[in-house]
């Protein structure tokens, strides 16, 4: 049992015993709200799945989720009046706990387009092209347990950055050629960095650049955010010619998350929130270069 709050519980459900309670929530969300045909909402996998119910303080079902034998998360549903209370996050985390207990190396899911950021914050990475399921736009997402998932494009790289910022305790590190246009100027990434930087307590975002002039000339939107929070953000530019030729770009946090793009001018690579060996290596490399690089005093507001 995992609690989502003082008046909410997440409990394992038995499909045969709890079928009606599971169906009531799922029909309300998928069939009536999202107009999914009833015959598509129920499938042959249902009796074989591990199911969860979210119960309110009076024991009434308000949310569902399931883990299928093909290692896929699905049927994530929370009744409309109960959204925004962390119930979806609690259901998802409980399924990840169960997947780890079973020793699964990876789980996947089909995310509706509007829910991509929700799953990204939990460490899921988009993969493959968008597709339609029951007439609704979806994209497949995966999460390694532990380890890194393949990153195929800018949306997947952004998803990893959202997760790194969301899981970080006190620190983020970014190594970039010139603030990665198409990635570090995305609104969802900027919002994630702002949320991290403005959380209570001491926070630090360190950014190493190979070219500090280009972001300033192009008006990179991360710079005004950093200038409003000078106690959090610090920028340095590499000086050593060897560092200037380093081909990769990467990010790491202080909880074992990492994103590594072998060719920094491309978005593809690997990343995840549970990749401690890579995160440690990247942090050590970052510290060495940081110490021999120059502070970007030109970024400060006069």
Over which residues does each language-model region extend?
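PLD/PLD-like phosphodiesterase catalytic module centered on the HKD motif
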Residues: 147-173, 177-302
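Conserved GNAT-family N-acetyltransferase fold
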Residues: 52, 63-65, 76, 139
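Conserved acetyl-CoA binding element of GNAT-fold acetyltransferases
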Residues: 68-81
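Conserved active-site tyrosine of GNAT-family acetyltransferases
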Residues: 26, 119, 124
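Conserved acetyl-CoA pyrophosphate-binding loop and the N-cap/start of the following alpha-helix
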Residues: 82, 86-94
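Short amphipathic alpha-helix that is part of the acyltransferase structural core
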Residues: 2-51, 55-60, 72
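Conserved catalytic-core motifs of GNAT/GCN5-like acyltransferases
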Residues: 108-110, 125-140
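Conserved GNAT acetyl-CoA-binding A-motif
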Residues: 99-112
